[in-house]
């Protein structure tokens, strides 16, 4: 599906799939849980899902003769960390807008984790006091113009690399990769669980798995707390990506499965249930999930297993998208473990 698109390698190769044996047994053993470790996909600044997307975006950035990657996220954005890492790797400058998306108070929140790594990698970090929104932001557009005014050649990458024209391609590749791994494993996964916020990871998976009719087996767990906007954006990206890869069929709103029950109390703030899911996964599997994204999708998957959402005997693949550095911004929350 991706043969005609240029790819700039930023990852090690296919990511490992491991069985979550102890977590599966803890939840009754009737559903078999697996994780695809996108969090271990690269040596670039702790890796993560954004690199899979950026592999199809960076060739366009280089071809444009730009010299500066310009992007945006929250204070503890995993995406902006990855932009900083890739900019360093390819010899570009990096301008990052970090908005106050999360109403979280921690004495070190803006000095540790992702934003610390971005600064170490040489990014020009601009803090902006604006609330959460997955759409195009004025502060980002102003940063692009500022780079131009100073003689730079900006290459704009939106939040999460999601509404970029090539933002969905990387996770079409994820689906193709899973199909190869399923042949090696000797079975197919019945469901794929993924955290959904800006939407292109979910959208790309939907398109990729639509090739063999499994688009509705991709179960998005909303972490945005703006699910209507998020679902609309996932569908828009999926449709655009389907055209790019010549899927040959139209995707509908019904093809986007988004479960809205776990994003509370608000984007970036973990509920008690999210915190318990983070601890449970860490203590049973040694696998770290973060309070913003993967902790909420892990909470969702655990709860869905408990509720019987997945039929007995199901094999469920959890897409671990990364994000562990952000947990440093929640040091007080987890001060006692």
Swiss-Prot record:
Pfam families membership: PALP (PF00291)
Q: Which NCBIfam families match?
A: ACC_deam
Q: What is this protein called?
A: 1-aminocyclopropane-1-carboxylate deaminase
Q: Which HAMAP family match?
A: ACC_deaminase
What SUPFAM superfamilies does this protein's entry cite?
Tryptophan synthase beta subunit-like PLP-dependent enzymes
The active site annotation covers: 77
How does this polypeptide assemble, per the annotation? Homotrimer.
Q: Which InterPro entries match?
A: ACCD_DCysDesulf, ACP_carboxylate_deaminase, ACP_carboxylate_deaminase_bac, TrpB-like_PALP, TrpB-like_PALP_sf
**Which keywords belong to this entry?**
Hydrolase, Pyridoxal phosphate
Biological classification of the source:
Bacteria, Pseudomonadati, Pseudomonadota, Alphaproteobacteria, Hyphomicrobiales
Any idea what job this protein has? Catalyzes a cyclopropane ring-opening reaction, the irreversible conversion of 1-aminocyclopropane-1-carboxylate (ACC) to ammonia and alpha-ketobutyrate. Allows growth on ACC as a nitrogen source.
- Origin species: Rhizobium rhizogenes (strain K84 / ATCC BAA-868)
Q: Which family does it belong to?
A: Belongs to the ACC deaminase/D-cysteine desulfhydrase family.
Q: What is its EC number?
A: 3.5.99.7
- Which cofactors does the annotated protein need, by name? pyridoxal 5'-phosphate
Matching entries from Gene3D superfamilies are given as:
3.40.50.1100
Q: Name one GO biological process term.
A: 1-aminocyclopropane-1-carboxylate metabolic process
